[in-house]
Structure formats: C-alpha cells, structure tokens
Design a protein with these regions (language model features):
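Alpha-helical cap/lid subdomain in secreted, periplasmic
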Residues: 37, 66-82, 91-195
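C-terminal segment of classical bacterial N-terminal signal peptides
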Residues: 2-10
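Serine-esterase "nucleophile elbow" of acetyl-processing enzymes
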Residues: 16-89, 99-108
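Boundary at the C-terminal end of the N-terminal hydrophobic targeting segment
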Residues: 11-15
C-alpha cells in the first residue's frame, strides 16, 4: 500500500485520440424501412465469421452486432430492432451460403449484413468461385424479400499479406453493384483513418 501511495500521479490524464468520423454511406433498405414505418419489429441478421462473432472483442457485448443493437436502440427510441449475431469463426462464402436458409432466411429478417471474404483470402479462394457463391447468396436473400449489405475485409496482416484480400474486396464491390446490394467497405473506412 505504501508503494501505491508514493507512486507519482500524472498531473492530467491523456485521453485517447479519436478516430475521424466515418464517411456517410447511403443505403437503400426498402424492406427495413417498410417494417419500421409499419411499426413492426425489425430484424437484422449479421452473417459472417469471427469479425461478426466478436472473437477478439473484449466480451460479447462489444461485438459489432451487439454494439449495432445498442446504437439503434438509442437512435430509434420507440422502435424495436433486433440484431441477431450469426457469425461463426473460420467460415467464409461456402459455409455461410450452406447455412443461409436455416440460420438467416428462417428468422425472416428485413436486412442481412453479410461480412465475407477474409477467410476466403487467407484460404486463397478463387475470386470467380467466390463471386458465384456471393452472388447466389445475395440473390437468394433478395428473393426472400431481404435487403442485403455486403461487408468487405478489414485491414489485418494475415489478409493484407494475400493478393486475394484485395481481389475479393473488389469482387464484393462488383457484386454489390451488379445485384443492387449495399456495400459497407471496412477497407475504405480504415484507409480513411490512415490519412
């Protein structure tokens, strides 16, 4: 205890630097908007791998789906929006496509945020096969009346070390345009932070 009492105390605590504000992303989400306008519970499914699951988050309450749930509750008082976490560590397009019907469509969401490509990059997935799988999945979701936002890769050493990381991000952008899905580019956001 004497050691603690005699330790020097900084005159003023330093606050952590803040990230610059994220650029505004305009998304067309007619099914989600219709549910909210009608006063119905809106359901968002976060589909993906460990980034979605929250593998490296300090606790489950800090996974991005949990934070999204909290922020939506604060931003939309009076409306109920449920965000369901369907992230499974190590998965990518083949595994996520295989469980689309049971894990996603079955809960009848208005919106799916599909984080895909990081594990594919580390596995050196063929970009054309990746394109086919993601396109098939997005079309299946849209046919079920679900809005889709694709989420690309975050910058991290294991993904950045592969040429597939950039290629699969490019494919996601192309698929989003081709099929009319939204795109949330974590890569572009992180590049903005670096400037």
């Amino acid at each position: 205890m004497a050691l603690t009492a005699s330790a020097p105390v900084p005159a003023r605590a330093q606050s952590a630097p803040e990230c610059p504000p994220a650029p505004l992303i305009r998304l067309h989400l007619p099914h989600l908007q219709a549910a909210l306008t009608a006063g119905k519970e809106a359901v968002i499914v976060a589909l993906g791998s460990s980034s979605t699951r929250g593998e490296k988050a300090s606790d489950p309450a800090h996974s991005y789906p949990a934070v999204l749930q909290t922020r939506l509750a604060q931003a939309l008082p009076g409306w109920h929006v449920a965000v369901l976490n369907r992230g499974i560590n190590g998965q990518d397009a083949p595994e996520e496509l295989a469980r689309l019907s049971a894990d996603v469509i079955a809960v009848r969401p208005q919106l799916v945020i599909w984080q895909v490509g990081a594990n594919g990059a580390m596995r050196k997935s063929d970009p054309e096969r990746f394109r086919q799988r993601v396109t098939e999945g997005v079309r299946e979701l849209q046919a079920a009346g679900i809005d889709v936002v694709l989420m690309d890769n975050q910058h991290c050493p294991r993904v950045d070390a592969t040429p597939e990381g950039v290629l699969l991000d490019q494919v996601l952008g192309q698929v989003a345009k081709q099929v009319g899905a939204g795109l949330f580019s974590r890569a572009a956001l992180m590049e903005t932070w670096q400037r």
